[in-house]
Amino acid sequence: LAVLKIVADTSFLMIPGLFRVDIFAELNRILQRRYEILVPEPVVKELEYLSRRGTPSERSAARLALSTLDQMKILPSSSESADLTILEVAKKHPDYLVATADYLLQKRLQKLGVNIIRLRQRTHLMLEREIE
């Protein structure tokens, strides 16, 4: 089986700090195969900004997210926008999954037919469609 590629946005990487959900354990549970998490550069910039300028809970969640980046791969991007970068990557790579807790981004990705990993009931992750 090929290694699954998962593009993560800021909202997804903030889940452990905001909702105390272990995203790695959850990804292992729902995917049951090897995966690599890809983080677009603008997402890293958003996390860095939130770690300095967010609300107290955002700051600690962003710091926690930044501390896990060494287990992920950073995707260089020419765009400043995290959402646009994610949409571009998803269009270019239809087999990639996108992990996001952002409802509006989920809607845009659904229109493209992208398989989404999302947070359910603030307690666990869910895969929108089974992986072929």
Predicted regions, residues:
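Domain-level signal for Mg2+-assisted phosphodiester chemistry and nucleotide/NA-binding surfaces
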Residues: L1-Q71
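Nuclease catalytic cores that cleave nucleic-acid phosphodiester bonds
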Residues: P42-E132
